């Protein structure tokens, strides 16, 4: 959530940040709400001061011997009660305006960091580095073709069970999925992450706190009879793991790793990636999440990105690192690096991880704080990154490991988990 103080004191900074995202927002109504709230607060404080003064005057007069039921005391109490009613009316006005203001502010994305990479869309993103040697060739198959030939899954029966964009994994694919999850968790735990297994259902406050609501309501699956939603990413429940808390500074950074099933309606992707594991309504993911101090979050983004990269390196999968421009940033992010893995069958790089520094954006929405060096409460910073998306990782392994005899060579790092170095046709 954007800081209301910034909205009052430096609206031009907000306008510039939103314009760099391609948004031309009229902040006038929001500024008026802020001014009205400030005026009402001053009026309420003045009335409360008058009320306190009357209360003291009543006490003094009673001490001086004036009877409780005297006309003077009664008049003062009537005046005090009138002030209380006025204060109550003002508080209701403040609540109403504050709700309207919050509704609109919640729809505004995070502001890009200073000196961000400017740009309108993904075409303006910047490649920072590459790792590994991408293979290529006209005979290389896409992962969904390989999976069909090896009988690794069934999407047709899955559409009977649920609908399109679901898959059921069988035998080696199911085992490979489980192996990848355990491998990734173990790798990150060795790097100092604390494993958590959060709920797959979250409430509206959790989705609002992380920034998924209200903007992405149409992208999420919602329960009909409860205030619960299927989580689109473990980022949501982990953000709310400390909602409303003050985390001691000496505990920071808090580094969590979580496996979770993720659910997305993919409402805006009709006709895209209809085959395979790239874009499903349900998929598994290992998520990395940091709570950090404000002054260390820039370095934390570099580290969380490096930790996500280490998975690809261990799995011997070529990839590149992309810095997103301002026009391509996610809603809650102020800076993001995407990791794109090479898919030789498709002859393209595809996003497999997105690592973001959200600054205090989620912390403000979720009221998560820490102490500064002067013991004053301040908002901390949050960061997240996929470490990695399991289905897309499997797709990359199938495509990069394919052999001329139809078998799939598996990365050495997976052998202790999978129990074999190959997937063989049966």
From Swiss-Prot:
Pathway note: Aminoacyl-tRNA biosynthesis; selenocysteinyl-tRNA(Sec) biosynthesis; L-seryl-tRNA(Sec) from L-serine and tRNA(Sec): step 1/1
Subunit structure of this chain's protein: Homodimer. The tRNA molecule binds across the dimer.
Known catalysed reaction(s)? tRNA(Ser) + L-serine + ATP = L-seryl-tRNA(Ser) + AMP + diphosphate + H(+); tRNA(Sec) + L-serine + ATP = L-seryl-tRNA(Sec) + AMP + diphosphate + H(+)
Stated EC number for the protein is 6.1.1.11
Q: Which organism is it from?
A: Prochlorococcus marinus (strain NATL1A)
- Annotated S-S bridges: none
SUPFAM superfamilies (alphabetical): Class II aaRS and biotin synthetases, tRNA-binding arm
| Binding positions (L-serine) | 233-235, 287, 386
Which of the seven top EC classes does this enzyme belong to? ligase
A GO BP entry = seryl-tRNA aminoacylation
Cross-referenced CDD domains = SerRS_core
Cellular component, GO annotation: cytoplasm
| Domain comment as written in the entry | Consists of two distinct domains, a catalytic core and a N-terminal extension that is involved in tRNA binding.
What are the protein's UniProt keywords? Aminoacyl-tRNA synthetase, ATP-binding, Cytoplasm, Ligase, Nucleotide-binding, Protein biosynthesis
Q: Which InterPro entries match?
A: aa-tRNA-synt_IIb (IPR002314), aa-tRNA-synth_II (IPR006195), aa-tRNA-synth_II/BPL/LPL (IPR045864), Ser-tRNA-ligase_type_1 (IPR002317), Ser-tRNA-synth_1_N (IPR015866), SerRS_1_N_sf (IPR042103), SerRS_core (IPR033729), tRNA-bd_arm (IPR010978)
Q: What is the protein name for this chain?
A: Serine--tRNA ligase
Superkingdom as given in the UniProt entry:
Bacteria
Protein's UniProt keywords contain tRNA processing: no
